[in-house]
Amino acid sequence: MKCPFCGNSDSKVVDSRPDKGGSGIRRRRECEQCAKRFTTHERIEEMLPLVLKKDGRREPFERTKIISGIKKACEKRPISVEVIERLVDRLETRLQESSEKEISTTLIGEWIMKELHDLDEVAYVRFASVYRSFRDINEFMQELQELLKK
C-alpha cells in the first residue's frame, strides 16, 4: 500500500478490525520508510448492475461518484460522513437485491432523493435541483411546494 506521506509502497499492517458497518475491514498501517501511520479500508467487490446513463452509455456503478454527489448536497448540514456511507450502503444493497443487469440513473436518483427527503429536506432540495435539472424557477418552486405539503 502506497504511503500517503512519503509515497513509499512498503507498509506493514499493525491493526485490522471490521469497519463499523461490518461490510469491510479497517486496517492501520505503518510505512516502513517514514514510520508514519495511516488507515486503509477494504471492501468486498460486489457484483452490481451496470448504470444506464441518460445518453445511453453504460458504466459500472461507482460508489465514490454517489458519495461525492450526496456530500455536495449535504454540505454545511448536520449530516456525518458515516450517515452518508450508510445511505450508500443501503443503495448498494438495493441494487444487489434488484437482480437487474442494468439500472438507470433515473431510478438511482429517485432512490437517493427518497433517502435524502427522509434525512434532511435541505439536502434533498439541493440534490433534486441538480438531479432533476429544472428548466426554470417555476419548476423549482413547484418541487418546493410539493415538499412543503408533506
UniProtKB/Swiss-Prot annotation:
HAMAP family, A to Z: NrdR
Its biological purpose: Negatively regulates transcription of bacterial ribonucleotide reductase nrd genes and operons by binding to NrdR-boxes.
NCBIfam families: transcriptional regulator NrdR
Zinc finger (unnamed): 3-34
Family, as annotated: Belongs to the NrdR family.
PANTHER family, sorted: TRANSCRIPTIONAL REPRESSOR NRDR (PTHR30455:SF2)
GO molecular function (one): DNA binding
Protein name: Transcriptional repressor NrdR
Organism: Pelobacter propionicus (strain DSM 2379 / NBRC 103807 / OttBd1)
